Every structure is written in C-alpha cells, then in structure tokens.
Amino acid sequence: MQIQKKIEDITFTPMTLFGEEMEVSENIVMASAAGWYVGAICKEDDGFIQPYDRYTDYYATPEEAAKVLEAM
C-alpha cells in the first residue's frame, strides 16, 4: 500500500464499527498492486495503519486519482 500524503498530515476521525473503536482517515490517494485509487485508511489502537476502503476504480497514475479526489 502506498499513500500519496504523509501520515501526520492526514485527518483521522474516530468511529465505532462493529463494536470496535478505530480512527478512519479522510479520503486520500492511495495505491495497491492494481493501481492508484481514492480510498481511506484506518489506525488501530496500537497505531497500526491499514487500508480501510476503496471508493473509486483503479487509475494508472496518482495524478488521475487526484483529479477524481478533487471532484468528490
């Protein structure tokens, strides 16, 4: 997983999901082996960061995904 933004610059919002507290990020440009996309990450109590959700299709470049994020 790649993230286009520094972790310390990402805004996280506390959420309760399935009885568990976690912090979920704002929408950000991310990448996986399949390509670049707009999604979110979550931060667990121990500080572990992992992908949370993907909101768009995959794109070939981070610039393409960033344009979609700007339009959201």
Task: List the predicted regions and their residue ranges.
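Short N-terminal "domain-start" leader segments
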Residues: 1-46
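Short intrinsically disordered terminal tails
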Residues: 1-3, 67-72
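Generic alpha-helix signal with a bias toward terminal, lower-confidence helices
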Residues: 24, 48-50, 70-71
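A short, hydrophobic secondary-structure junction motif
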Residues: 36-40, 59-66
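A short, exposed loop/beta-hairpin motif centered on an aromatic-Gly-Thr core
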Residues: 46-64
